[in-house]
Amino acid sequence: MKSDQFHRLVGLIYEASADEACWPEVTKAWGHLFNDAVVALDYGATTEGAEVPLLSTHDFDVAARDLHFEEYRTPTDNPGIAALLKAPINAPVSIDSFLSQRDFDKDPSVLAILKPQGIDKGLLTTLKRDPVAFSFISIFRRRSQSDFDSQERHAQQILSRHLSK
């Protein structure tokens, strides 16, 4: 992880908070910082799962998510949403901490949205949560990529704090 990329991303986060047109640049830089990770930033999702407005992505198949949105929009239907609603704010949660590999390979939401993209690992981070809405960022890696290491998890936590301001 390069220090200059990290500091550039922090600056981009604050630029995007003033100009929404910068969010695609933020998610692209986020993906590059984490060795070409797939990034999905959702802002203002309702806790009932009624709506999950996607703010910005990098290399994430939004069409697959939208196609299966109704089926996997609630914590009952999507273990990732359940984990995000329980996780501490700004604390990255690894997919393998709430789903065994066996369960991951069988989960309908994973099979519909993540597996077709070759995604098999990820860090999910809740940015904000209140009784009606929450925001989160997910960074994923594909089968051919390594898992997230402790330095990357720490960087994700620091960056998410900037993002949640």
Name the predicted role of every residue range:
Residues 4-151, 155-162:
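Regulatory input/activation interfaces that engage signals or partners
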